[in-house]
Amino acid sequence: RVINDDCPNLIGNRDLYKKVEWICEDCSNIFRNTGMATLCRKNCFFNEDFLWCVYATERTEEMSQLRQWVGILGAGRE
């Protein structure tokens, strides 16, 4: 079960969420810092820690796709 109150469009988009969240999990594993995943997911992935994790996990070639997915998940966010 996936719960993230920061992402208003999580329902119906769990597959996208899992793809984006995987970057946060990888980042947390790379740096052995469990709090990193939480920081990465903050504000539905719309934060500097998420971008930092994209670079740290060497996923920059996917940046435009990731931005699109984060936009979908966070649509309607205040």
UniProtKB/Swiss-Prot annotation:
It is found in: Secreted. Pfam families: Crust_neurohorm (PF01147). Transmembrane segments: none annotated. One of its GO terms (molecular function) is neuropeptide hormone activity. Keywords: Disulfide bond, Hormone, Neuropeptide, Secreted. SUPFAM superfamilies: Crustacean CHH/MIH/GIH neurohormone. One of its GO terms (biological process) is neuropeptide signaling pathway. GO terms for cellular component: extracellular region. Inhibits Y-organs where molting hormone (ecdysteroid) is secreted. A molting cycle is initiated when MIH secretion diminishes or stops. Also has significant hyperglycemic hormone (CHH) activity. Belongs to the arthropod CHH/MIH/GIH/VIH hormone family. Its main location: secreted. This is Molt-inhibiting hormone. Disulfide bonds join C7-C44, C24-C40, C27-C53.
